[in-house]
Amino acid sequence: LLSLHDFLILHPKIAIFDLKIVRFNKQYNMKRVLGLGNALTDILLQVSEGDLREIGFPKGSMNLIDAEKFEQLQARFISVRKHLVAGGSASNTVSTIAQLGGKAAFIGKIGCDEVGNFYREDLMKNNVTPLLLTSSLMSGCCIVLITPDGERTFCTYLGAAADLHAKDIRKEAFVGYDICHVEGYLVQDHELIETALRTAKEQGCTVSLDLASYNVVNENHQFLKDLIYKYVDIVFANEDESFAYTHLNPEEAVENIAEQCDIAVVKVGKRGSYVRQGNQLHHIGAITSNCLDSTGAGDLYAGGFLHALSDGFDLRRCGEIGTIAAGRVVEIVGTKLPEETWDEIRRICALYRGFMHKLKF
């Protein structure tokens, strides 16, 4: 595990650039990224192991619930302090890209209600272009149960988010974007996710897919394999998801997945991550973090990685930027990093960019 200070020491050629001199330019020319996923507002609750056992959901799982179960959980934890943030996996990823200065947009569906308005405003606040459709259903919400070890268990009422269908996917929405990042949770609707991936590919996008959750992979194993083989260029998975997909250990899993797409990423928590493309294999160590809540860690890793990739960084640098973003978000409750933390990551991106520019000239 590396502290950020140690990280820069291990990169002396980069560290020679004075952080006070290098300035981040939001107009820097880079590829545009489009996210597609469930538009969900997260309700974050810190609970005990006993609370989680009583509810009966496996720790670390993603569980779809109906409106009745949603109301029951709300009532069960009525006295617990709640923290609301606009979330959803792909939305978190593109928000990260936008915060780091990238150009990003998000496609999802919300209700015509206060929660939906909050969601739209939050995207714009984070410099993400909202390409949102509306539904007569209530906006989707996700109750995130966070145990003392920082692990999170999702109880998701999709609501309007689940009202996004294949017929809503228009090729015009993909025009002008270079990368399309899709969350694996959409695999619950086979027609929707296949239409989205196929349309993105037809419009010339590099297609990125996050495998979402091990139980989603288990329930849709062969369908996911077919999707990846036909449409996907970049796959993100954590250790549990990669095992569900390949039944292999992480190092073997990243090799197996990379045989089916262009770039494979397997995240292994405190042990860092593996990134593979062809014969290139990189192991990126984690940075030192005081883990409070792992919500969004994988999403921010993907955001940091894709931002760096869109900026022309090599694979190791992409993994390092993803690692730093993930390492910082686990230190807070929720997924919204404070501005000073974003500034820290932006400066590192600028250092890398300045170093690459110096190498060229």
Regions flagged by a language model, labelled:
Residues 26-105, 361:
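Glycine-rich phosphate/adenosyl-contacting loop at the front of the ribokinase-like
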Residues 7-12, 17-19:
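Short hydrophobic targeting helices and cationic amphipathic motifs
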Residues 69-141, 348-351:
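Substrate-binding N-lobe of the ribokinase-like
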Residues 98, 197-201, 258:
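Surface-exposed amphipathic alpha-helices with a cationic face
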Residues 203-206, 211-283:
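Conserved phosphate/ATP/ADP-binding segment of small-molecule kinases
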Residues 131-134, 144-187:
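Conserved phosphate-binding/catalytic loop of the ribokinase/pfkB sugar-kinase fold
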Residues 31-40, 46, 53-59, 64, ...:
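Conserved phosphate-binding/catalytic region of the ribokinase-like
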